Amino acid sequence: GYIATTTANLYVQYLSNGQYDEESRYQTLNWTPNYGVITNINRIIELNENADTKVAASANGSNANQVATANILKAYYFSIMTDRWGMLPFSEANKGLENPFPAYDSQAAIYDGLFAMIDSALSSMDSGNGPSGDILFGGNMATWTKFANTLKMTMALKLSKADATKG
């Protein structure tokens, strides 16, 4: 799995690392797989908001709830990424050839965007079915709400160390 691969990567890099650690070019993880997941999440959102595909997508649960859970999951991935790397492409990310060189956003701007994304997702949920095939919470929207609020709380705790007025 993911942890086993990371551990093996660390071990190999420890043995192959040069004498001067500050000049090491080795890195255990990069953000490419995370942006790949976010691309898939954006596709879910697109399928549920596009007039041509919306009806077919509703067979997998309420369109609003699919978009809400996708945005919560996207916020989760971006929170992990910004905690690890700090500044990264957020507001202009995942535009493909439309914007091959997205600007980097500050961590403060990313966190502001993530709080807004989660709040929007929570307010857009409806009483319809949650997403079918949901391997995290089985389509249980109450659990998705708890997860979203927990994510907001964790982000606020992290942010409180940097900016007490926001956290």
Give a label for each model feature.
Residues T7-M87, L97-G133:
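Conserved, well-structured interaction surfaces
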Residues S24, P89-N94, G139-M141:
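Solvent-exposed, flexible loop/coil residues
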Residues G1-Y2:
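Hydrophobic alpha-helical membrane-insertion signals
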Residues T82-A93, A162-G167:
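Short, well-structured active-site flanking segments
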Residues G133-G139:
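N-terminal post-signal-peptidase region of extra-cytosolic proteins
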Residues D112-G130, M141-G167:
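Aromatic-residue-lined binding/catalytic grooves and analogous aromatic/hydrophobic interfacial grooves
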